[in-house]
């Protein structure tokens, strides 16, 4: 497996979907603008534009789990469906990755660098996507 692939990550939510892009070579990720969702349904044209612009080799979707590692009845199946739709609509290779505590970590990082003003919903969601993606890199390569 090449370690110079580009990877796009999504932090799925019912109102907002965080987005980040990263490189396996460096193991780092950067936030992109969060996408709006209406009751969990994104604008698929916006997803398509992001995929066309960044042309990732892989897409990682955060998998919401409870602290014990079990599925959350209200959101986990929807995140899985979102991942399956990305694969089905766009033919992307998609992996799910445990996103436990990613929002907590994202808020802490944003607050550290920008105080309360940095804690907007879109910033938090895309920073969560960064945390998910960097955690995925860490799991792959230690």
UniProtKB/Swiss-Prot annotation:
Belongs to the YqgF nuclease family. This is Putative pre-16S rRNA nuclease. GO terms for cellular component: cytosol. GO terms for molecular function: nuclease activity. CDD domains: YqgF (cd16964). The lineage of its organism: Bacteria, Pseudomonadati, Pseudomonadota, Gammaproteobacteria, Vibrionales. HAMAP family: Nuclease_YqgF. Could be a nuclease involved in processing of the 5'-end of pre-16S rRNA. Keywords: Cytoplasm, Hydrolase, Nuclease, Ribosome biogenesis. It is an enzyme of class 3 (hydrolase). GO terms for biological process: rRNA 5'-end processing. It is found in: Cytoplasm. It comes from the Bacteria. Disulfide bonds: none annotated. Its EC number is 3.1.-.-. SMART domains: YqgFc.
